[in-house]
A protein has these predicted regions:
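A short, proline-enriched helix->beta-strand linker immediately N-terminal to the Walker B motif
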Residues: 156-160
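Short coil-to-helix segment of the ABC ATPase nucleotide-binding domain corresponding to the Q-loop/switch region
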Residues: 100-107
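Catalytic Walker B motif of ABC-type/P-loop ATPase nucleotide-binding domains
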Residues: 162-165
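Helix-to-loop junction immediately C-terminal to a conserved catalytic motif
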Residues: 54
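Conserved ABC ATPase signature
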Residues: 137-141, 145-147
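ABC ATPase NBD coupling module
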Residues: 71-88
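Conserved ABC transporter NBD signature motif
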Residues: 62-70
Length: 223
């Protein structure tokens, strides 16, 4: 079953008198349980596609479907609910709440979602070497540590879809591989649809499919 689908999606914007096509007409889907990567040069439209897929920005035309429901037909409050309940975002900037400790970052997810403590999320903290940092504030963490906390936070809510924009950018090689292995495991064992934008071609071996984005046009990469 398709967890996420883009139908005839385009994105353009005005730059003075010129119209820039950030994303040319795109048809793209990811099934549950699949882990796909999108590669391509900077400025090619990868992040634009990801933010549209997650409903963080609207397309100029076309449709976004999340688990069989048309996302862009919903009002913003309903879209926000779908984003929170169905999608885990891992962005290049960790966007942690500056006045909350690592532990409280995760407790905030529990509070908003009215959920019980997520044991799997706490296990992820240990797996990523963060268990001794739970009482630290973001300013006390390195860039790589903040990014790893953001990854755990994104997975903590047990979303059905994971959208990761350069999730390993600030990590060393060992931790980068560990994160990608976790994303692959989440896809396979928990039947999640996962899309990862990356520049690191060493990491795509863990993916089921690899897509190439060039000049706003997406195509499946065939070796």
């Amino acid at each position: 079953m398709k967890a996420i689908e883009l139908k005839n999606v385009k994105k353009s914007f005005k730059d003075g008198d010129e119209t820039i096509e950030a994303l040319k007409e795109t048809n793209f889907s990811v099934d549950k349980g699949k882990f796909v990567a999108i590669i391509g040069p900077s400025g090619s439209g990868k992040s634009t596609l990801l933010t549209i897929a997650g409903g963080l920005q609207s397309p100029s035309s076309g449709e976004i479907w999340i688990n069989g429901r048309a996302l862009n037909e919903k009002k913003e409050k309903a879209r926000a609910k779908v984003r929170f309940e169905e999608i885990g975002f891992i962005l290049q900037a960790s966007n942690l709440v500056p006045f909350l400790t690592v532990k409280k970052q995760l407790q905030l997810v529990d509070k908003v979602n009215k959920a019980k403590e997520n044991r799997a999320g706490l296990d992820l903290l240990k797996r990523l070497g963060l268990e001794k940092l739970v009482d630290k504030y973001p300013e006390e963490l390195s860039g790589g540590e903040r990014q790893r906390v953001a990854i755990v936070r994104a997975l903590y809510n047990d979303p059905t879809i994971i959208l990761a924009d350069e999730p390993t950018a600030s990590l060393d090689t060992e931790k980068a591989y560990e994160v990608v292995k976790i994303l692959a495991k989440e896809a396979k064992e928990k039947n999640k649809a996962t899309i990862m934008v990356t520049h690191d071609l060493r990491l795509v071996d863990y993916c089921d499919k690899v897509y190439l984005m060039e000049d706003g046009r997406l195509s499946e990469k065939v070796d």
